[in-house]
Amino acid sequence: MMTPPNPLKGELNSNKLFISIIILFHLVGLTGLLIPSLRPQFLQLVPYHLLLMLAVIIFSHQNIDGRFLLFVGCIFIGSYAVEWLGVNKHLLFGHYQYGQTLGFQLDNVPLIIGVNWFLLIYSTGVLMQRSRLKSMLMRVISGALLLVLLDVLIEPVA
């Protein structure tokens, strides 16, 4: 007697593929950034890396509907607005500016900043959903602290 195919098996295999792509590209990027002679070349690849990670998340997301697109759009628009206020009016985060690492800028703010914010917020949200923290408040606080820590770590590169 034949066993019916497991419809989840294909989903599990593609999730493993997406996770493998994320791990591989992050390890290669980290290695390139840590080797002084390769650092300038790898910094030029940062926008492409962010776009690749965006593609991986979009392709792996289970339900792309109006709510998801609204979520993405709000992050893109909101993050650009917040960064514009920070860079041009020195509000919220103090006095700072972006270098060329994140690529093309519109009014001193990299256009890809929305992708970066989306990746960070989405990934942190997934991590907090899968965490063992029972309290929603603790997940929100932990997620916010994690985002601040990540920002402190990646800010020098941007």
Regions found by a protein language model. Give the residues of each.
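Aromatic-rich, lipid-facing transmembrane alpha helices and their immediate juxtamembrane interface loops
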Residues: M1-A158
